[in-house]
């Protein structure tokens, strides 16, 4: 099929790509949220990866067309979301203007009405890519509640830093088409790590890797406070551990691929801080268990009482956007602390898997 080139226009277009595989339940609301945008997209394309159950693929196509979207099908894709997007972008990029914007969003993420308007306005200020912050959907019981608190703290931290982020979110992000074309060319020329397309299908976290690629081509990125959305949470602890292991190992491997540069320094520093934090927590737990085992008992020093009080207040203040009930519940130190320990344990596992070159899968 031959695409008709889009003639340059005064107002750049916004084209949405929604890669989908099995999201039959969420896709209708995704498309509804896109139709409700204060600055509607000029074009919405749902790009389908064939499911092993052909009925599910057919249902996704029906839902997409009913929601007013175009439907594309990936062909011969073996690399999940990244491969699906690479195939779609290989069709799309040659026929769009460099100033057009391409919004890539997950098929289980619901954009708030102002998302496109806010990100498009920000991109007009010279940014190569504009992301956002997200809230967690309901569900998942205690596991989901911790994630919703975590997302609220991330949004608060991003707002405090005026949109500065280490990594663009893969849930929804607006890219300047010209920036993606530069990434593709830089991969071919060897200026960036080689890949089969815009997204590196070898990376566990393709969104993190693309962020590094854009930065190394000197594109600015940002996540405006008002660019918000709602996305899924992992509903079980094993699912959360699997997700975070992929995120943490993928981020570490991306840093290794790019080495130590002006754009990776902060990432390496965060890796070091996370490792030190996990090490201190491990040492603390081991020492407590040891003292209890030998019958020495545990004496709580005034310093630790003060530190615990500070931790409780910090936990409450950083989730106040979720309401006073959540803030009060967050002051229960032990549940929040155990969630931190859980994430630190996953981080140590990611370090070990990377060092030992264990199989990479998700």
Residue ranges, per PLM feature:
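Short, acidic, metal-binding catalytic loop of nucleotide-sugar glycosyltransferases
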Residues: 32-41
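Long helical/loop segments within the catalytic core of UDP-sugar-dependent glycosyltransferases
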Residues: 75, 80-97, 113-203, 245, ...
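Short beta-strand-to-loop acidic/aromatic patch adjacent to the donor-nucleotide binding site
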Residues: 95-110
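Catalytic core of nucleotide-sugar-dependent glycosyltransferases
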Residues: 150-155, 241-261, 312-314, 346-352
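Catalytic donor-sugar/metal-binding loop of nucleotide-sugar-dependent glycosyltransferases
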Residues: 208-229
